[in-house]
């Protein structure tokens, strides 16, 4: 782990390679798992206030569950996460003509109907952020459904943090991303000395 301000960064951010390969996985991270996508409190408000522009892109079962229980529920760690439909898929998922999962929130954003792109936890995936007492732990989430993305990342030689430049900058700012580049350079220089 590398300490940067109030963040503990996994070395995997700099050592692992990753590029989402939706052609291979079909967006499985949006439909598999044991809980919905983590939400920040302000994101709950945004989703609740934006439902009218998001609903036209949602599946009926997603709309039904949100009308019954709301846009989120509390997971086993007592953290807010997106609501799920019966099969475990995120309530905001819809499927395109290739049967790949798509996000109704992101669709509303791409069509100019919403300023909010999607929850930051979704945007940052495969990185997960865990709030600790005095730190945020920033870790690469190893999940077999992303093995094709790791393979593609290796083929294209794209490190996890570089693949995630946009969401990292969205969450922590441009200066933070610049610091990641500096850390990466230091790690590479140390590896050359070995």
Question: What do these predicted ranges mean?
Answer:
Residues 1-194:
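Short loop/turn segments that flank or connect secondary-structure elements
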